[in-house]
Amino acid sequence: MTKRVLVLVIAAIAVSVLIPPTRAQQAPRRQPGAVYDFDFPGKASGPAPRRSLSGVWEFAKGGAEGIQADGAKAMPSDGKPEHELPFTPEGRVAFMAHKPTYGITQVPSALTNDPLPGCDPQGFPRIVLHNARTEQIIQLPNQVVILYQFNKKWRVIWTDGRELTKDPEQPGWKTKDGPPLEPRWWGYSVGTWADDYTFVAESFGFDDRTWLDNAGRPHSDALRVVETYHLVDADHLEKTITIDDPKFYTKPWVALDKLPYRLQSASFDIPEQECVPSETAKYNSLFANPAAGVDDTGK
């Protein structure tokens, strides 16, 4: 690469740090080896299996469907009145303290206090509300395990009948035995079948240092998340996520609304996608900090 081309590339990247981001996180239209609904125009699917979530699931309409740069897909931070979240006064204060790089309160990346660029755990539900990619669901007799492409993370949803507490001061399971449990980045999750084709999971006991999405939406230790997985047919399921946090929001709100996934081949190999602290530090030093007029100490 010539020096002139290199300078132009660096300048373009630096400018992109300051302008409102459009789709910097765009995923490719398809994952290598994946299939999508547009690959089978007009082809009908068979009946849905009963009580079976197992398989590799990719977004039915294309690989970029899970990229939610401006916030949760069903409620983006775009300034539209219908997408204004029902903050409590405490919740709004928490929201305004966050400095995201996307949404209506965005700042240059060098000035963000988003914990994710430093590779802190994104936790749940942010794993599916900001940069969702391919998922593999493994259904066991007493658990549903979900493997996520991003950072190679996983969650366990227990289906053995245990119950969640309702007290943020005592997160975890309702039990008199064992040591006291602590808040978790991924919460504590239980699930059950509402009918033969609908699985409902509930999660509680979250570490409140995580954000809900890229737009800096906050949550408290009282957050409760409800996931609904509906088997539509042999090839599709729909995912809905509802946020219920009475400390920060006056009423529950839907973050994902029947987002469609398509079943992939059992031989589908999920690509690797990692957050690398050294790469983030290098990017900040070379581009983000100079573009925002700060040095490597952030001042």
Regions found by a protein language model. Name each.
Residues T2, P20-K299:
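PEST-like low-complexity, intrinsically disordered acidic/proline/serine-rich tracts
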Residues L8-V17:
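Bacterial N-terminal signal peptides
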